Design a protein with these regions (language model features):
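Thiol-based oxidoreductase modules, predominantly thioredoxin-like and allied folds used
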Residues: 2-4, 22, 34-41, 45-60
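Short loop/turn elements that flank and shape the SAM/SAH-binding pocket of Class I
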Residues: 9, 58-61, 92
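Structural cue for short, hydrophobic secondary-structure segments
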Residues: 21-23, 75
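Non-catalytic, surface beta->alpha helical segment in thiol-disulfide oxidoreductase systems
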Residues: 75-104
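Structural micro-motif
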Residues: 59, 65-74
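A short beta-strand-turn-helix
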Residues: 1-17
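Short pre-active-site segment immediately N-terminal to redox-active cysteine/selenocysteine motifs
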Residues: 16, 23-26, 69
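The canonical Cys-X-X-Cys-His
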Residues: 27-30, 73
Length: 104
């Protein structure tokens, strides 16, 4: 599910468990990662909320999150960043991020 920077910041500030894939439409690895990330998000039955966000459409929040390259996946819990992964990830690695956030 696509999210805006403003909505993402609201969810982080509320202390929700959030994982966001930050991507750009011109990025080749992002195009490969997006369906993998969405598959994990669609099968996710935990309290973790998963979103995608276009960094070019949300430059201010991307900058505030320290995004320097895409794709980047960031996870948050209790208003704080928990993990950051840069580059193309496998489905199992994304599942590990979800599990770490649930059990962490």
């Amino acid at each position: 599910m696509e999210i805006t920077g403003e909505k993402l910041q609201e969810k982080i500030n509320k202390g929700e468990k959030v994982i966001v894939e930050l991507y750009a439409t011109w990025c080749g690895p992002c195009k490969i990662l997006k369906p993998i990330f969405e598959r994990v998000a669609n099968t996710n039955t935990t309290e973790v909320q998963m979103y995608t966000m276009d960094v070019d459409a949300n430059k201010e929040i991307a900058a505030s999150l320290g995004i320097r390259s895409v794709p980047t996946i960031k996870s948050f819990n209790m208003g704080k960043p928990v993990d950051t992964k840069v580059g193309l990830l496998q489905e199992s690695q994304i599942n590990d991020l979800v599990n770490n956030l649930v059990n962490g």
